[in-house]
Amino acid sequence: MAKEEQIELEGVIVDTLPNTMFRVKLDNGHVITAHISGKMRKFYIRILTGDRVKVEMSPYDLTKGRITFRMK
C-alpha cells in the first residue's frame, strides 16, 4: 500500500492496553485501537494516558491505527 493512501489524524490516549496497544480518542470523536510504530519502539518513546498523538489509519479498517508521533 502506498504512503499517500494512509489517513493521518490526531487524538488523545484514553487507555493503555497490553502489548504496547493503546485506545485513542480521535478529534472527530471516534475511539480506535492503535499500536506504536517501529521507530518509536526502537527509540523507547514512552506514551502515557493523556498524551496527544498523531495516528495513521488504513482506509480499509478504520478501527485500527499506528501511532507515528507524540506531541509535546
Curated annotation (Swiss-Prot):
Keywords: Cytoplasm, Initiation factor, Protein biosynthesis, RNA-binding, rRNA-binding. Residues 1-72 form the S1-like domain. One of its GO terms (cellular component) is cytosol. PROSITE patterns: S1_IF1_TYPE. One of its GO terms (molecular function) is ribosome binding. Transmembrane segments: none annotated. It comes from the Bacteria. It is found in: Cytoplasm. InterPro entries: NA-bd_OB-fold, RNA-binding_domain_S1_IF1, S1_domain, TIF_IF1. The keyword Membrane does not apply. PANTHER family: TRANSLATION INITIATION FACTOR IF-1, CHLOROPLASTIC. NCBIfam families: infA (TIGR00008). Belongs to the IF-1 family. Component of the 30S ribosomal translation pre-initiation complex which assembles on the 30S ribosome in the order IF-2 and IF-3, IF-1 and N-formylmethionyl-tRNA(fMet); mRNA recruitment can occur at any time during PIC assembly. One of the essential components for the initiation of protein synthesis. Stabilizes the binding of IF-2 and IF-3 on the 30S subunit to which N-formylmethionyl-tRNA(fMet) subsequently binds. Helps modulate mRNA selection, yielding the 30S pre-initiation complex (PIC). Upon addition of the 50S ribosomal subunit IF-1, IF-2 and IF-3 are released leaving the mature 70S translation initiation complex. This is Translation initiation factor IF-1. It comes from Alcanivorax borkumensis (strain ATCC 700651 / DSM 11573 / NCIMB 13689 / SK2). The gene is infA.
